[in-house]
Amino acid sequence: MSLLEQLDKNIAASGGLIVSCQPVPGSPLDKPEIVAAMALAAEQAGAVAVRIEGIDNLRVARSLVSVPIIGIIKRDLDESPVRITPFLDDVDALAQAGANIIAIDGTARQRPVTVEALLARIHHHHLLAMADCSSVDDGLACQRLGADIIGTTMSGYTTPDTPEEPDLPLVKALHDAGCRVIAEGRYNSPELAAKAIRYGAWAVTVGSAITRLEYICGWYNDALKKAAS
């Protein structure tokens, strides 16, 4: 059974939750052993996969979890706005660290390495390739280039203003166009995640609402302050 077939089976049985285990940078939780513990807890709670950033985090998580890992490396580049897995060496390192799926930025922006070359390198390692996209055009272009999975990860993050709500219409449009879609980005409640499935998502990635304690505390603090004013 292929990894996609196994994921199809697990998603049908469990509902399709993917947990992104990416603490706030510099947080007390931003340690490989804690990231790995989050990943294991997510697996034990029914997540069908986890998303992990960074080689050290991935290596430790790989030693603990059996569910597929979506691996990424984030970089801040002077010459490009692309942050997610921008280099071929990043793909190689993620493959060696134990990723099952490697995600790249799939947007049509200036970049050091083409999307086509990155996808080909992922497939060279016999791994699944995921493209984090911001629009229907991005998603369809990446699908034509061979991406196995299209994520809505970048919707709202390539423009000056980021909306509060997730981009459900993008999920539907990509699904209707024949893409295997992972809904990702601002799915901060179970209700929104369920909506994504109804809009055609294959699975839903949730990060901040599960693994970023500072964000969650901030939401509660803001609500309590408003209630008290």
From Swiss-Prot:
Entry's Gene Ontology molecular function annotations: N-acylglucosamine-6-phosphate 2-epimerase activity
Intrachain disulfide bonds: none
Domain of life: Bacteria
Catalytic reaction equation(s): an N-acyl-D-glucosamine 6-phosphate = an N-acyl-D-mannosamine 6-phosphate
Gene Ontology terms: biological process: carbohydrate metabolic process; N-acetylmannosamine catabolic process; N-acetylneuraminate catabolic process
GO CC terms in record: cytosol
Pathway the protein contributes to: Amino-sugar metabolism; N-acetylneuraminate degradation; D-fructose 6-phosphate from N-acetylneuraminate: step 3/5
Enzyme Commission code(s) on record: 5.1.3.9
Keywords, alphabetical: Carbohydrate metabolism, Isomerase
Function as written in the Swiss-Prot or TrEMBL entry: Converts N-acetylmannosamine-6-phosphate (ManNAc-6-P) to N-acetylglucosamine-6-phosphate (GlcNAc-6-P).
HAMAP family: ManNAc6P_epimer
Family in the record: Belongs to the NanE family.
Protein name according to UniProt: Putative N-acetylmannosamine-6-phosphate 2-epimerase
